[in-house]
Amino acid sequence: MDARLTIAYYIKTLAEKYEDRPAIYFKSAFRTFSFSYRQMYRRSLGVANYLAQKGINKGDRILVWSYNGQEYASILLGCALSGVVVVPIDFGSKADFVRLIAEKVGARHLFHSRRRPVPQTSLSHLCVEDLDQELAEVPIDKTDFGVREDDVYEIIYTSGTTSDPKGVILTNKNIVSNILHIAEVMPISSDNTCLSVLPLSHMLEQVPGFLYPLSFGCAVTYLHSRKSTAVIEALRRHRVSIMVAVPIFLSVLRESILREVQARGRERLFRRMLSLSSHLPRPARRFLFRAIHKKLGGRLEMFFTAGSALEPALEEFWTALGFQVYQGYGLTETTTAVTLNTRTHQRTGSVGRCLPHQEVKLGPENEIWTRGDNVTPGYWENPEENAARWEDGWFKTGDIGEFDGERYLFFRGRLKNMIKSAAGLNVYPEDIEPVLCKMPGVKDCCVIGLEEGGDIRVHAVILLEKDEAWDNESVRSMITSANQILQPHQQIQGFSIWPHEDFPRTNTLKIKRGPVLQEIQQGKPAGGATRDNTVPQSSGDRILDLLANLAKVDVQTITTESNLVSDLGLDSIARVELVTMLEEEFNLEIDEGAFDAGTTVSGVKEIVAARQSETLHYGFRRWSRTWPARVARRLLQVVAFRVPSLFSRTTVKGRENLAGLKTPAIFIANHTSQYDVFYVVRALPWRLRKIALAAAADILFELKPGDSWGRWLYVRFCGFWATLLMNLFPLSRGSHVKRSFEYMGELVDDGWNVLLYPEGKITLTGEMDRFKGGIGLLTQALQVPVVPVKIDGLYSIVPTTDPDRLRWIPERFGRVSVIFGKPIQIDPQADPDQVARTCEEAVRNLS
């Protein structure tokens, strides 16, 4: 046995080699956390020892039902170190399916997200959000668990029927050998960053998207949301250079680019540029389309794609833009890649050549057969399937392909999808669908074999563009046009217009042909899915589950008329959290201002269905953090900080509490005057003056349609100078709080301190008001020290009694005290409202 073919050896070696190099970035709702190779290994050892403490040992099975992130990665690797068999469950699965899999494999434990209800089982379980807190109590007693290369690492349940799913067994040797096979033909440099957009429950993400880039010392970025806006922002912030994606992702991204080109009236110019680029070297193509590259982060270079067929036209489009697209072929049963296009051996339209140390041949009916160390030893407790899928040591993939003269493999479709025509000829839907999809007005299509009069007929199910108006005659004419392109045996003999927003799809966005065929045969819905950015008709249950989870009440007690505040107890703290959960669950953009004290559950459903989102009437001035702005700020502050000396004498207390402060940090202060910021920043030591200050968006930053010229000049002039002088940024006091919170996360990620006034407004009485609940949620999410600051005496010098009129002229000369308290470390698992009260008392009690 070769210890080098275990994931345990693999991960330990990487930790020793790359040590403090970043391995994982995780973008939470508001900020990004980084974990080095050494930290990743230690966390994984923590998971291994946690399982051992639970009496879960080598060969036992555990489930993971969560979103992508550093916790998921730690659990996967912790199981690899301990020999415990991990069974990943797709995060979109229902609780009943989780319970079914738990019974099938005899699971001992469940790691799950608190975003999902715990299945009614006797399993012990732990929320992944609590994993760090749990691991802090676990001693690392053991580092070698005796894992061998043939030990089972995981069982992956493929997207078959939920009544009888198939569990694919994968060993350590399967995983590591496949990584080595890919790495041998596609080495990459360690300065690359890979962005994860596929679920870790899928092998395409686990190997090419996670373990393969780690083998070269690269970093992998995980997102709390896979919305397009979050993906684009991650590409920019993390300078992503590699993505592993399914073809439909590339197709959707292409359509987005083409829509923008059309909106700008540049279609003809764009087509000419595409035509020209085919004759240019790749650097020139990247320069020609530099605006697109800039939008996608500027450093994105290559896509690895598999999971379904990549249309040659789609591949040529991205290649023409200057990107590298490498298509491969593989299955869960083959631990992903069997063939792959590479830098030196690539052919458009093919899925590449066979990887080293593997074998591929074509069996009867051109079925792809393969064998190698990467191929599964079999299905979990399924002898019938095991007997059917192997022959003389060869694994029968169920896919159809053909080789060209240079042994490039071309994928032709699934054997089970093949339609046997009345003439006895083989018809492959995958050959027909690209032709149909090129027809004007066709969003997508699914070709099936429909039985009529004892014969199997080629039937097209067509999803039309939302804005297109079609009748049957128009569609029939379009089918005729397609048939003129298709071969005689491929002729479409009938069609249906798909009535739903989208086809039902797998977690990798492939169309589920079974439910489509069922609906066409029965003439009734089979539970279709929805387009991106729209809500399924069955979304009510999902919304109720989220609300019940957030409000900590029984879902049965919630009705459509339940009020978010009076019935469910969701105050302003929960508003941002609810919006974040809804946006991620339904892939929407929702404005927090849509929810108020009068919103009911039915109102939430209407808001989600309508995808209401107000326009943001201000931006965040990132130029204020550049070096020229910082130098100018220091010079201006030399003069500005003398102004308070004209009407006050300042005493600073508690500076010793800042001596060992680890930055970045959040400073929270009471709000007595618009001069507060001058006193607080001037009182800070020089090393802490890398700080950004929150200011009310509606006062200094917000411009709305219809605003007067006076308002426009005020915002442009005063907003500019205030931003330059004090590095102010807009904080919404109504809607768009989440945007401001995200910007604060960006500031903290870049090492900036932040000054906040949690009261949300200047006091009109001189007494400190209660802190807004959002400060609890924010400080928990940012996970940095919180420093309480109290300003005393300034209100009596510059009192504000009218909220609509800010006072700038002092009434008298006086004494002002600025008091710094001891930094507070916020418990991320505490009640956010209690955190807000703790922060409030910390400021109130300073003297």
Q: What are the residue ranges of the model-derived segments?
A:
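Conserved pre-ATP/AMP-binding loop-to-beta segment of ANL
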Residues: E19-P22, P139-Y157, D164, P187-T193
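AMP-binding/adenylate-forming catalytic core of the ANL superfamily
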Residues: S93, L110, L362-P364, G372, ...
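Conserved AMP-binding/adenylate-forming
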Residues: A284, L288-L409, L415-M418, K438, ...
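Conserved ATP-dependent adenylate/AMP-binding module captured primarily in the ANL superfamily
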Residues: N49, F91-P119, E137, N178-L195, ...
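A cross-family acyltransferase "interaction/gating" segment
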Residues: Y222, F720, D749-L755, G760-A830
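Conserved AMP-binding/adenylation subdomain of ANL enzymes
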Residues: V176-T193, L200-R290
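Conserved AMP-binding/adenylate-forming core of the ANL superfamily
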Residues: I24-G69, L77, K94-R99, G146, ...
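Conserved C-terminal "lid"/linker of ANL adenylate-forming enzymes
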Residues: C446-G449, T480-V535
